[in-house]
Amino acid sequence: MAGLDPTLSTSHPFYDVARHGILQVAGDDRQGRRIFTFSCCRLPPLHQLNHQRLLEYLKYTLDQHVENDYTIVYFHYGLSSQNKPSLGWLQNTYKEFDRKYKKNLKALYVVHPTSLIKALWNIFKPLISHKFGKKVTYCSNLRELREHLQCDQLLIPPEVVRYDEKLQNLHKGQPPPPTKTPPPRPPLPTQQFGVSLQYLRDKNQGELIPPVLRWTVTYLREKGLRTEGLFRRSASAQTVRQVQRLYDQGKPVNFDDYGDMHLPAVILKTFLRELPQPLLTFQAYEQILGITSVESSLRVTHCRLILRSLPEHNYAVLRYLMGFLHEVSLESISNKMNSSNLACVFGLNLIWPSQGVASLSALVPLNLFTELLIEYYDKVFSCQEAPGEHTRDTVEVQQAGPVTKEFMKTGTPRASPYLSRLRIS
């Protein structure tokens, strides 16, 4: 069956709905917002799907992400009288998705809209707020969608791709000239985004921690640890690109000038997401997916075994980042970002498959693995120390407060309240 997720377990509470692949997670957009795709062509005939269960499944899935900003891509092709939900169901669904769902939905792309969509929009217009309506973008074809999103990240059903090609063939007149892709240019010596960790090390006197990572972590540690929703909110796409250009050109960035504590957080996530290979490496992906099958008391030990296979450089950067995120989690009373919430944000920024994107069911082990690294930071990273890591922060240690000094010198932040309850191997 098209869209069937090979990693989906039959024990999934909504296996009867999830197996159709109607709703998929599709990585992040350019602003770091999680993308979901809803494909009408994967809706089975009415008699084969309980639409109340579909609604419950949608809420169950989105509930895991709606505290963060997110984007939805709706592929309309494939909706027919055989699988089309009733107007009553649509109206009830809109009411069921209350403010928490609508507030953090930042963009809704409707692909291949028809007159039916426009008619439905007129019907529901009295119920839809003007603010929500501004989030909707119509895309007549996939080419228009590519102007907004990186479609190579999306799980676009083959049926939708074929339909789009058919539309293009039916288009009258001269086809648009083929787009000429300029040859790739070598990165700048000061480039920070889209280059490998090795490149950054070579261009920065052997420093293991990439400059942009160090700068953003230092700023957030000093001024942003108690910011509510840290790493959950997005920032202006234009501002993010501007800051990226400044960093890539080797120019200084003063985040105080922007007045948005979420901006350095987005820059940090963007840096991780644009690495040519994920920080946890493609090779570790399948091992990480197996974390849920490991006995709970042995999971931290299993995490340490997986990390042993990482290149030294990746391990050093990961240890530095996880130590900081552990500090963030210790301020969760103020920032509302405990280790579980941070894991939901960072899971797909640390690891993704070499081909395609992670499925919805893969998010569970990926996020669990990330949560273990953050919550049990001391135990996971206690037996390995990347050579040279303790020497890079001398200046920062001299200028930092006692908590930061302890972390910089020992690699161990303040004792976690979670660790007092830890009874694992």
UniProtKB/Swiss-Prot annotation:
One of its GO terms (molecular function) is GTPase activator activity. Residues 174-189 have a biased composition (Pro residues). One of its GO terms (biological process) is signal transduction. Residues 13-168 form the CRAL-TRIO domain. It holds the Pfam family RhoGAP. Signal peptide: none annotated. Keywords: GTPase activation. Highly expressed in skeletal muscle, lung and testis, and at lower levels in kidney, stomach and colon. Not detected in heart, liver, spleen, breast, brain, neonatal head or pancreas. The record marks 232 as: Arginine finger. CDD domains: SEC14. SMART domains: RhoGAP, SEC14. Residues 169-192 are annotated as: Disordered. GTPase activator for the Rho-type GTPases by converting them to an inactive GDP-bound state. PANTHER family: RHO GTPASE-ACTIVATING PROTEIN 68F (PTHR45808), RHO GTPASE-ACTIVATING PROTEIN 8 (PTHR45808:SF4). This is Rho GTPase-activating protein 8. It comes from Mus musculus (Mouse).
